[in-house]
A protein has these predicted regions:
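Helix-to-loop junction immediately C-terminal to a conserved catalytic motif
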Residues: 412
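Transmembrane helix-loop-helix hairpins at lipid-water interfaces of multipass membrane proteins
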Residues: 23-86, 170-175, 182, 285-289
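Juxtamembrane loop-to-helix connectors within ABC transporter transmembrane domains
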Residues: 118-163, 222, 246, 260
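Hydrophobic alpha-helical segments in the permease module
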Residues: 80-87, 184-186, 262-265, 269, ...
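Cytosolic ends of transmembrane helices, especially the final helix of ABC transmembrane type-1 domains
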Residues: 228-232, 256, 301-334, 338-342
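Transmembrane helices of ABC transporter permease
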Residues: 23-29, 153-205, 275-289
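ABC-family ATPase nucleotide-binding domain "signature/switch" substructure
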Residues: 441, 446, 457, 475-478, ...
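ABC ATPase nucleotide-binding domain helical subdomain, centered on the C-loop/LSGGQ "ABC signature"
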Residues: 423, 430, 437, 455-498, ...
Length: 605
């Protein structure tokens, strides 16, 4: 119970937990109406059987002006009917509100999780698999709220109904009520002892199988070409089928375990009630008929609540694993968010100054830059010192594993240095990452393109009505994409599919270049951004970028040496250190490894 309370406090933070308490108060009110309706049975039966009007009957009669017996029966009948009408109406209202409230909070939790994932440090993000994120924000959240939270609320509601009716029976007929309470308590304990472990097991299987099925789906979709070419489609289908069937079978077993009490308890209940009625008849004789009827009425009302209560416990057990995983994710990300002072998820997207009105010249300095991954003792980069003047171009060259991409991630601000600083006009970029990001146009080797139009792909993150069509066309022209786009069915409004499947690899890279230029950046960073281009197209784009403005600082990572032939500075990296720096010709003369690369590339001097 304490654990469930803690989870509810986390799943419904702040004032939302107060609303949850209000929901419980509403459930208690419904229980009182039900008790009032059931309690009204006793005076009706007593009056109908000619019992003397005394005690509480006399008090009620005096309240209504001492009416005759028939009128009193009608009064209690109206109370009974009104009590059940109000109980039904309140139940519907509370149920509708409760379902909406829980569903809304489930959605809010999923959004907050994604917000945390999107704002966490890049290093932490790299450790998470896509499947784990999808399972957390979708499946864990759904199972935790739909099964665990709703299960707890339903359990509380049914428990209150049973408790109120049992209190009424204890007041009116204590011994039979105690016997009934003991009997059903033992039955409940026995059932839960049998079903608890099995419900938890099925919940664990559902969680693990769902994660496996999601992984299998992502692998199958992302690896489509290789899977088809290697003729292993059946294997990937089998992996997905196995996990999906595990999940379906576990869900089926969980549902069966939740329904099992419904059928078994009916039999157990009838046997128990029959025994108690026989006991009351023997010990009290015919005078106990009204009380027997009341007892039967109360028990008939208790049975469905009792069945639903036990089933709700099964739901809670089934959702326990998902709720534990969700709690762990929320706690971990919230702690991370507090440390990094992450903002909450926005209610609506902001409209930022997406296009920089002017290019603000940027000087970049790397001071004693060292970086190690948290799980490694060996630094990837060691004592990097470099000055990149405003409006100049620099290229990072080196073999695989030399640290080029890590250095770019540090300059971008995605990684924080282990020691040293990246300075923007003399100020550490880590002190104002949003401002730094705003000034950068970044083109990775593998450009991310959502299922969108050409216009949306260039004006990344903006709605069509928010983007500048004239600037979109201008950037497409610089990226040598005008003819390609005009050949499409709907021009810049053509849907190009996820990862721009309608375009070639080179065209996707050019689309990435157009996107980076759309923001009118002060710094353009190109990480193998022209690797899929032919020499002629690459040359045209390079010349076009040079003509845009001499104020842009350009940083290039490339293996193809033709890309970096005319940069102002060429930096050769080896084993995480700068071993040579200068013009292309100077580095060629200083460094034998680079000179050998030039010879292998057959580049003219």
């Amino acid at each position: 119970m304490k654990e469930a309370y803690h989870k509810l406090r986390v799943f419904f933070p702040g004032k939302k937990f107060n609303l949850l308490i209000l929901n419980v108060v509403g459930l208690f009110t419904v229980s009182l109406f039900e008790m009032l309706g059931v309690a009204a049975v006793l005076p009706i039966v007593n009056l109908a059987m000619g019992a003397p009007i005394e005690g509480y009957l006399k008090q009620v009669a005096e309240l209504f002006g001492n009416p005759d017996r028939t009128t009193l029966i009608i009064i209690f009948g109206v109370v009974l009917v009104l009590a059940f009408i109000l109980k039904g109406a309140f139940s519907l209202i509370i149920k509708r509100w409760s379902l909406g409230f829980v569903a809304t909070q489930q959605s809010t939790t999923s959004v907050n999780l994604l917000n945390r994932y999107m704002r966490e440090p890049y290093l932490a993000h790299r450790k998470r698999g896509t499947a784990n994120i999808l399972v957390s924000i979708n499946d864990y959240a759904h199972q935790a709220y739909a099964a665990f939270v709703n299960g707890v609320l339903n359990f509380i509601g049914e428990l209150l109904s049973i408790a109120v009716l049992m209190v009424m029976l204890l007041v009116i007929m204590p011994i039979p009520a105690l016997l009934a309470f003991s009997y059903f308590g033992l039955v409940s304990y026995g059932l839960q002892h049998i079903l608890r472990k099995k419900n938890r097991e099925q919940g664990v299987i559902v969680v693990e199988a769902t994660r496996g099925a999601t992984n299998a789906t992502i692998d199958a979709v992302d690896g489509f070409r290789e899977i088809r070419m290697h003729n292993v489609t059946d294997r990937y289908l089998y992996r997905y089928q196995t996990k999906r069937m595990d999940s379906v079978n576990a869900s089926m077993r969980s549902t069966f375990l939740q329904d099992f009490p419904k059928y078994s308890l009916e039999i157990i209940f009838i046997i128990g009630i029959a025994g108690l009625l026989a006991f009351m008849s023997i010990t009290s004789g015919t005078q106990s008929a009204p009380y027997l009827l009341l007892f039967c009425g109360a028990c008939i009302r208790i049975l469905p609540s009792y069945v639903r209560m036990v089933a709700s416990l099964g739901n809670v057990r089934a959702g326990e694993k998902a709720s534990n995983e969700l709690l762990r994710e929320i706690s971990e990300l919230d702690e991370q968010g507090r440390k990094l002072q992450m903002p909450p998820a926005p209610v609506a997207p902001k409209n930022p100054e997406y296009i920089n009105k002017t290019i603000a010249p940027v000087r970049i300095q790397l001071e004693n830059l060292t970086f190690s991954y948290p799980d490694s003792d060996s630094p990837v980069l060691k004592n990097i010192n470099l000055d990149i003047p405003m409006g100049t171009s620099v290229a990072f060259v080196g073999g695989s594993g030399s640290g080029k991409t890590t250095l770019i991630d540090l300059i971008l601000g995605l990684f924080a240095p282990s020691s040293g600083r990246v300075l923007r006009n003399g100020e550490p970029v880590q002190d104002d990452l949003p401002g730094w990001f705003q000034s950068i146009g970044y083109v990775p080797q593998d450009v991310f393109i959502a299922d969108s139009t050409v216009r949306e792909a260039v004006a990344f993150g903006l709605e069509p009505h928010e983007s500048d069509e004239e600037r979109v066309r201008y950037c497409l022209e610089i990226a040598e994409l005008t003819e390609v786009v005009e050949s499409l069915d709907e021009g810049i409004m053509t849907m190009i599919g996820h990862n721009a499947v309608r375009l070639s690899g080179g065209q996707r890279q050019r689309l990435g270049i157009a996107r980076a230029l759309y923001r009118n950046p002060s710094v353009l960073i190109m990480d193998e951004a022209t690797s899929a281009l032919d020499n002629e197209t690459e040359h045209k784009i390079t010349k076009a970028i040079e003509k845009i403005s001499k104020d842009i600082t350009v940083i290039i990572v490339a293996h193809r040496l033709s890309t970096v032939r005319h940069v102002d500075q060429l930096v050769y990296l080896s084993h995480g250190e700068i071993v040579s720096c200068g013009t292309f010709t100077e580095v060629q003369q200083q460094n034998e490894e680079f000179a050998n690369l030039v010879r292998l590339g057959q580049l003219p001097e």
